[in-house]
């Protein structure tokens, strides 16, 4: 009896230890999500570098500047310049700005870009309301000026402006025709997002989202032509007109908002703000001058998310990131996977710092606030959180931090997620840290090298018929396909034993991607990853 009691007690202790370990593991996962994005800039309220205290005081007295009316909506970066846009209201002295290294009481001071002359808008010659911006690969800054002021009242025609970032000179300005900028049926229009597809300097397509008119506008810079598309996938879903962020709710009726262009597939991803859906259109359809609007194919799913999504961006290897509204976080999905709920993961989640991610941008080799350079070729994400629920409800506490620009290395964000595994597979990244956390002692960095494992001294040249000099074992020379089945007895490393079928990274991986030789543990057609670690299960459950 005593022995049985001891056994029960011991089993109870063991189970308690296992349960405790599981809880601690989940806590660590939540902690990682909360700190995935690092704060780069933050503001209690927005202020400007007016050049002098006298100039600032005069702006306040005249009503030109009111710190309670300045709300940021977009961010982008080029070299050492971080751009921030502010929707134009009374009290907003400049809509397009750069962050300076000067500090004010509310946070870093902003300076108009390119200078104060463009901040004057009364005669419509300057920048009225630069809602969204984009930097392209030719060092050009594209600015979408909605022409709206004071809660979206029309003042000037909407327009596209293009700046040469190397000289800060305006190189082009094009007005968007009225019949393109508004819905012909409802007469409504509010241009809120853009995505730039720069094939070359004279062949660039710009896509613009009209959230109020529920349309998608296309601009071709070669001939300054505009086209407007309509689709029911642009319309808001009446089931989801109520948004709740950090316990605070508001109601709006907005259609298509966040859009993002994939550099891999040329798919344009989008969703209405008031929707749980995610859609895309293959922009290759528009390269045919004879395309017909009625024949444009739109793909996607109506209820693939469990919350509304805002800002969007796609990495160079086809990973789409979305700002989640109700979850106060960022999700990802790899476009090489089937577009379904099970394909998503959460890469960041923080109820305080990630409230309303209205903008996300990805760039390479970003100096973080001019201080740190990422390794060559790495991608870096910037995200803007602006607590839009408080903008709508007009209940800011300007003693709190309200606006943040956050950043993270893209590979770090995706580590231990489904997106990371597929991302590294397509990038040819040999970092097995994203593939199998249990294999800590294996030499995985060269696992994708099909013809050589020089670190082990075992050269596998397909065309050699008799040569296996490194291990002196000539038992089975398979001369036709160069697949030498040598045990590699010198180092006991069997990673290179079978070129056709073996997963070379550890010898213990269960997912043999035999057809394409891509040994990164994921068969893209098999969504049930047998080696998914606890972090991944924890992430994916948040979207269900």
From Swiss-Prot:
Keyword Cytoplasm: no
Ranges of the Sequence repeats in the UniProt entry: 424-428, 429-433, 434-438, 439-443, 444-448, 449-453, 454-458, 459-463, 464-468, 469-473, 474-478, 479-483, 484-488, 489-493, 494-498, 499-503, 504-508, 509-513, 514-518, 519-523, 524-525, 526-530, 531-535
Cellular component annotations (GO), alphabetically ordered: extracellular region
Region (Disordered): 421-544
Main subcellular location of this protein, as a coarse class: secreted
Sequence segments annotated as region (23 X 5 AA tandem repeats of [NKR]-[RQ]-N-[AGD]-[DNG]): 424-523
Glycosylation sites: 183
Tissue: Found in and secreted from the hypopharyngeal glands of the worker honey bee (at protein level); expression peaks at 12 days post eclosion. Expressed in the brains of worker bees. Expressed in the brains of adult worker bees peaking at 12 days post eclosion (at protein level). Expressed in the spermatheca of adult queen bees (at protein level); Expression levels are higher in mated queens than in virgin queens. Expressed in queen bee ovaries and male drone testes. Expression in the head of forager worker bees is lower than in the heads of nurse worker bees.
Molecular functions per Gene Ontology: double-stranded RNA binding; single-stranded RNA binding
Pfam families tied to this protein: MRJP
Keywords: Glycoprotein, Repeat, RNA-binding, Secreted, Signal
Compartments where found: Secreted
InterPro entries noted in UniProt: 6-blade_b-propeller_TolB-like, Royal_jelly/protein_yellow
Low complexity biased stretches: 424-460, 468-510, 518-530
Signal peptide positions on this chain: 1-20
Induction: Significantly down-regulated by the ecdysteroid 20-hydroxyecdysone (ecdysterone or 20E).
Entry's pH dependence statement: Optimum pH for protein stability is 4.5. Protein becomes unstable at pH above 10.0.
UniProt KW Nucleus keyword: no
Role description: Abundant protein component of royal jelly, a substance produced in the hypopharyngeal gland containing proteins, free amino acids, fatty acids, sugars and other nutrients, which is fed to developing larvae by worker nurse bees. Major royal jelly proteins (MRJPs) are high in essential amino acids and probably have a nutritional function in larval food. All larvae are fed some royal jelly (also known as worker jelly) early in their development but it forms the principal source of nutrition for larvae destined to become queen bees.
Record-stated family: Belongs to the major royal jelly protein family.
Domain comment as written in the entry: The region of XQNXX pentapeptide repeats is highly polymorphic differing in the number of repeats present. This region is high in nitrogen-rich amino acids and may function as a nutritional store of biologically available nitrogen.
PANTHER family: GH10609P-RELATED, PROTEIN YELLOW-RELATED
Subunit structure: Homoligomer; in the absence of RNA, assembles into a higher-order oligomeric form, composed of around 20 monomer units.
Stated name of the protein: Major royal jelly protein 3
Naturally occurring in which organism (per UniProt): Apis mellifera
